[in-house]
Amino acid sequence: MTDTHYDVVIVGAGHGGAQTAIALRQNGFAGTIAIIGAEPDLPYERPPLSKEYLAAEKGFERILIRPASFWNDRHIAMHLGCAVERVDPTQRLVFLADGRSMGYGDLVWCAGGSARRLDCTGHDLGGVHYVRTRADTDALAAELPGVSKVVIIGGGYIGLEAAAVMAKFGKNVTLIEALDRVLARVAGEPLSRFFEEKHRSRGVDVRLRTKVGCLLGQDGRVTHVELNDADPIPADLVIVGIGIIPAISPLVVAGAKASNGLLVDASGRTSIPHVYALGDCAAHVNSFAPNDIPIRLESVQNANDQAVVVARTICGTAAQYHAVPWFWSSQYDIRLQTVGLTAGYDQTFVRGDPATGSFTVVYGRDGRVIALDCVNATKDYVQGKRLVEAKALIEPGMTDPQYPLKNFMTPSPA
């Protein structure tokens, strides 16, 4: 027997889930809406978890996407602190971990993902932390007053942002990256080397081409990180940032097609009728990526923009997702803004001088602009976004920061 029924059930109370509900109401949807969230909290912003929230610069109320009154006023039911264990697409039912079932007219799956865990010996010792949820960050922050030596595993954005906060707190920080540079999977060498130098200048010991063998501990708590080819590193606390695992199992079991994420079309539809997916757990063909291979993007922009498309589709309006991807990161006094996708780039060049702390890395593929990484260069970001959207031809003058990027936009035919 079904405990309750909603016209739209949204699984996931992150950016994508919140924006789907908001966009449904903005598009005139008058039916019943429920958001199911595995965490006990109202939808909140995720990026601050490894930055302002971890640094205690913002309290939790300041990172809420909307206050409780917003959801109540719009008659959006919140079912928090409960996970979906199973989906029956034939009966259009979701089954919750607490034993309840819920019927749906349309199901929107935006459950995100879980932090990828270490699988080495000692992974379960006390003092080993991940930064994926508010509870993760709260647990990490609670231990900081009693520690001095922090080891961060992973040189992606989460690891770098956490390193910046730890350095600000005066901790002795070591950052371990298995590849030959930080941000190797998402950025070119000029940006990687800039961030490596910046972190080292703030006292962070950045170790590249370094792999973790195991974690050592005493009395159930981590004391050292043992490396495959070097002496163990003393550690009072370990922060792990090595990616996420998409939360898609219930839908895959129900028959949804997946490849590193639930496969969706340009309107967010999965292979199961009346089931949509978006955000971190959805894989789509993106016009700014090469070879029409489905990709999965982990960003607020992607989740929010896909949510708007799905909401419009549910409301009966033809909508497709074609937004240019963008992303940002803050570390120390650095504001990085990226636009486009670097996948398959075959050339890069730098506008400006990294030594000044303000520059832009431009990425090209087949002679056209495909992405930019802008460091403290907002004007380049704003103007460069138009170049990426237009897939503009690369021109020699683009390397000179004296020439605004808007000068290289080819005028539209009259």
From Swiss-Prot:
Q: Which UniProt keywords apply?
A: FAD, Flavoprotein, NAD, NADP, Oxidoreductase
Q: What is its EC number?
A: 1.18.1.2, 1.18.1.3
NADP among keywords: yes
Which Gene Ontology cellular-component terms appear in the entry? cytoplasm
Residues where FAD binds: 7-38
A GO molecular function assigned to this protein is: ferredoxin-NAD+ reductase activity
- For whether the record's keyword set contains Chaperone, the answer is no
Q: Name one GO biological process term.
A: carbazole catabolic process
Reactions listed under catalytic activity? 2 reduced [2Fe-2S]-[ferredoxin] + NAD(+) + H(+) = 2 oxidized [2Fe-2S]-[ferredoxin] + NADH; 2 reduced [2Fe-2S]-[ferredoxin] + NADP(+) + H(+) = 2 oxidized [2Fe-2S]-[ferredoxin] + NADPH
EC class name? oxidoreductase
Binding of NAD(+) occurs at 149-177
What are the required cofactors?
FAD
- Write out the function statement from the record: Part of the multicomponent carbazole 1,9a-dioxygenase (CARDO), that converts carbazole (CAR) into 2-aminobiphenyl-2,3-diol.
Give the quaternary structure.
Answer: Monomer. Carbazole 1,9a-dioxygenase complex consists of a terminal oxygenase component CarAa, a ferredoxin reductase component fdr and a ferredoxin component CarAc.
Q: Which family does it belong to?
A: Belongs to the FAD-dependent oxidoreductase family.
Q: What is this protein called?
A: Ferredoxin--NAD(P)(+) reductase fdr
Species this protein is from: Sphingomonas sp
